[in-house]
A protein has these predicted regions:
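Short S/T/G/P-rich N-terminal loop/turn motif that feeds into the first structured element of a domain
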Residues: 1-68, 87-101
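C-terminal structural segments of small proteins and small subunits
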Residues: 61, 69-80, 84
């Protein structure tokens, strides 16, 4: 069953550069596990970044999370000081289609 996650990263002042370095290292790995970065946005003050990420299933998601290459770059995430929250979500677009604005 496909999974979708919302990642919310709260970045302290000066943390964006290290967070970007971490993301540059780990986001390319998504494709190896069938994962997709559907959206990546950041607040204008660089204090919050949000990702919408999809995986074909739980097995692929867990394999991505346990990839040792992610652990190799964990020091960058720690150095960024980011507080990260990962929420499983579901799509409600069909209930309220975009208005076309």
């Amino acid at each position: 069953m496909p999974l979708t996650f919302l990642l919310i990263a709260r970045l302290p002042d000066g943390g964006a550069e290290a967070f970007d370095a971490y993301e540059d290292a780990v986001l390319p790995l998504l494709a190896e596990y069938g994962g997709r970065l559907e959206r990546r946005v950041r607040s204008l003050d660089d204090g919050t970044e949000v990702h919408l990420v999809g995986f074909p299933g739980e097995q692929e998601f867990e394999a991505y999370r346990n990839d040792p290459r992610r652990a190799e770059h964990a020091h960058l995430l720690e150095r960024s000081g980011a507080a990260v929250e990962l929420l499983p979500v579901r799509d409600l677009t069909s209930r309220n289609p975009p208005s076309g604005r």
